[in-house]
């Protein structure tokens, strides 16, 4: 938050519009005319009909390739896992949920504490690739599997080995070994707190795969496998989102020689391309709705805040893409626009006295209280109030109960009161302790707003007792807020410092004057890592009665998607070429058919 004057004297005009600092953050990188000109052909019925036909054909092949009467039952296990993994990587798994459950139920019945491999259970020739693939799939689908199974694949020196492929030689064997380590790497990302073997597997495979890319042996690795390795290293599970993964794997799998693909593989790839483009067409229409809404709004002409609604829509659509969640995506984007406007208002363009009045107006939900503020602040308040009331009305209608007071108190009031506390600290020159900062810095991430209204529009009935298991006062929601604050400050602390903002890095250095910035970053990144592990546990363990679609929203959008956006810097404040290219591939440019 930028420098804010502590108070306004009695003779000072509250309507002063002078800003304390000029923002150096980007404006709108996307022209509204371009958004409105998007006209995907994939909304035509013929594409949907072809997609539906492919789905039915794949279901038949899916089941025929997993015949329980198959003589080679161990190979059948691996085939099931490979099919499940493929449809998930390609982003078409929502069409095959019953088939996936049948496959994984079968795998789980055959799961062995020594892993999966060739031969009978009594004479098992262990296979780390199959075991890691099975472990990852089962854990992601909430089956109870222990990471201790990986201990079976360590030699006397503690190094991981692949099992049945270790005796083979040549390029084919090397590819199998790389595949094995890649599967272990992907599995090791789905770890829970205290799983030391998973942490060691993650470190071991990360080092191994980096050497593969850097070494001369990379020329011996299949092109598509090399693409998977690059993706795994650049976008580990917490930094990956559904639509970006699907687009990337469509391109990766497209590199495989057509003659080497099975009939099932060809159909899955064709469906993935069609499905991606059909969903993209839906997303473009939603983006056009938001673009028109914003262009017609009273705040469109205000210039004091960042205008990046395309990036905000991408934030959610890249993680939750299903057509039935259209209302949540539109609401999410509108809320993010409001939050950015308020963020920059509190950050740059208000004196402390003005912000106190503005916050009191929010607390009382009363526009008359801001009458004496500058025109741009009044416009901002009136638009915020109008839009908030509209979104609350949608939520009340969806839930069939009056939740207006609950939303006001637990979302907007909590968010802006935390911002006001920051403003007071900065105005008085106070640098809080690390713990004080985080106690206030978690609600001012705005996750309390983003994790409430869109949840209520997900199509699930959420009485307060259920809502409290995923929203306030749940540990799960606290972890979402904490992870958001930590990654924001760790990736953006220098820019925040230059901008006059507080960060947990600055507060840590005040508490530990003997420490360096590197020490502070290590501490914060350590906390972030622990936070993400606990979130894994909360998300993947069956501990509550929260509908799965709601847990997926909170976890994928507010946890993983934020890590994705910050993976290469701050993708919100300074939308760089990387983010722009990702938006293009996910929302604008269709997959070539």
From Swiss-Prot:
Q: Which GO terms describe its molecular function?
A: magnesium ion binding; terpene synthase activity
Pathway this chain belongs to: Terpene metabolism; oleoresin biosynthesis
Biased composition of type Polar residues is found at 1-26
| Enzyme Commission numbers on file | 4.2.3.56
Q: Where is this motif: DDXXD motif?
A: 343-347
Note describing how the cofactor binds:
Binds 3 Mg(2+) ions per subunit.
Lineage, highest ranks first: Eukaryota, Viridiplantae, Streptophyta, Embryophyta, Tracheophyta
Query: What cofactors are annotated for this protein?
Result: Mg(2+); K(+)
User: What induces this protein's gene, according to its Swiss-Prot or TrEMBL record?
Assistant: Constitutive expression.
The answer to whether the entry has keyword Lyase is yes
> Could you identify this protein by its name?
Gamma-humulene synthase
Q: Which reaction does it catalyse?
A: (2E,6E)-farnesyl diphosphate = gamma-humulene + diphosphate; (2E,6E)-farnesyl diphosphate = sibirene + diphosphate; (2E,6E)-farnesyl diphosphate = longifolene + diphosphate; (2E,6E)-farnesyl diphosphate = beta-himachalene + diphosphate
Q: What does the function comment of this entry state?
A: Involved in defensive oleoresin formation in conifers in response to insect attack or other injury. Involved in 52 sesquiterpene (C15) olefins biosynthesis.
Keyword Lyase included in the entry's annotation: yes
Domain remark from Swiss-Prot or TrEMBL = The Asp-Asp-Xaa-Xaa-Asp/Glu (DDXXD/E) motif is important for the catalytic activity, presumably through binding to Mg(2+).
Q: Gene behind this chain?
A: ag5
**Keyword list, A-Z:** Cytoplasm, Lyase, Magnesium, Metal-binding
Which class of enzymes does this protein belong to?
A: lyase
Q: Where is this region: Disordered?
A: 1-34
Protein localization: Cytoplasm
């Amino acid at each position: 938050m930028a420098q804010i004057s502590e108070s306004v004297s009695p003779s000072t005009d509250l309507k002063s519009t002078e800003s304390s600092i000029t923002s150096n953050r980007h404006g709108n990188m996307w022209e509204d005319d371009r958004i409105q000109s998007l006209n995907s052909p994939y909304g035509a019925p013929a594409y949907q009909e072809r997609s539906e036909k492919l789905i039915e054909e794949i279901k038949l092949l899916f089941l025929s390739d997993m015949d329980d009467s198959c003589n080679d039952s161990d190979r059948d296990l691996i085939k099931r896992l490979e099919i499940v993994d493929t449809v998930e990587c390609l982003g078409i798994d929502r069409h095959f949920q019953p088939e996936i459950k049948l496959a994984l139920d079968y795998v789980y019945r055959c799961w062995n504490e020594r892993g999966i491999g060739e031969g009978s259970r009594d004479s098992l020739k262990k296979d780390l690739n199959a075991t890691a693939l099975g472990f990852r799939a089962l854990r992601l689908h909430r089956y109870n599997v222990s990471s201790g199974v990986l201990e079976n694949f360590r030699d006397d020196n503690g190094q991981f080995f692949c099992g049945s492929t270790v005796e083979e030689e040549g390029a084919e064997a090397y590819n199998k070994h790389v595949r094995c380590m890649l599967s272990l790497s992907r599995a090791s990302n789905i770890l829970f707190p205290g799983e030391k073997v998973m942490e060691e597997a993650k470190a071991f495979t990360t080092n191994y795969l980096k050497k593969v890319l850097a070494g001369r042996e990379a020329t011996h690795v299949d092109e598509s496998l090399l693409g998977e390795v690059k993706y795994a290293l650049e976008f580990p599970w917490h930094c990956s989102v559904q639509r970006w993964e699907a687009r990337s794997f469509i391109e990766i799998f497209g590199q495989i020689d057509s003659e080497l693909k099975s009939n099932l593989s060809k159909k899955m790839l064709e469906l993935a391309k069609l499905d991606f483009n059909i969903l993209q067409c839906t997303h473009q229409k939603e983006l056009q709705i938001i673009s028109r809404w914003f262009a017609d709004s009273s705040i469109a002409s205000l210039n004091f805040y960042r205008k990046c609604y395309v990036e905000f829509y991408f934030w959610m659509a890249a993680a939750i893409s299903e057509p039935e969640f259209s209302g949540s995506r539109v609401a999410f984007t509108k809320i993010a626009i409001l939050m950015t406007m308020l963020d920059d208002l509190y950050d740059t363009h208000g004196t402390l006295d003005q912000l106190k009045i503005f916050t009191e107006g929010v607390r009382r939900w009363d526009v008359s209280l801001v009458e004496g503020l500058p025109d741009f602040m009044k416009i901002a308040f009136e638009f915020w109030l109008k839009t908030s009331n509209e979104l609350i009305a949608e939520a009340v209608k969806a839930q069939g109960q009056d939740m207006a007071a609950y939303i006001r108190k637990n979302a907007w009031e909590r968010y802006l009161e935390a911002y006001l506390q920051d403003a007071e600290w900065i105005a008085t020159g106070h640098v809080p302790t690390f713990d004080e900062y985080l106690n206030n810095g978690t609600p001012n991430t705005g996750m309390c707003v983003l994790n409430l209204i869109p949840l209520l529009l997900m199509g699930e009935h959420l009485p307060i007792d259920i809502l409290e298991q995923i929203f306030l006062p749940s540990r799960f929601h606290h972890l979402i807020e904490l992870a958001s604050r930590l990654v924001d400050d760790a990736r953006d602390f220098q820019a925040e410092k230059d901008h006059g903002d507080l960060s947990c890095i600055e507060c840590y250095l005040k508490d530990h004057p003997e420490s360096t910035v590197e020490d502070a970053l290590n501490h914060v990144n350590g906390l972030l890592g622990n936070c993400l592990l606990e979130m894994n546990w909360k998300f993947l363990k069956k501990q509550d009665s929260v509908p799965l679609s709601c847990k997926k929203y909170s976890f994928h959008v507010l946890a993983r998607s934020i890590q994705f956006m910050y993976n290469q810097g701050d993708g919100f404040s300074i939308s760089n070429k990387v983010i722009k290219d990702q938006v293009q591939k996910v929302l604008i440019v269709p997959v070539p058919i």
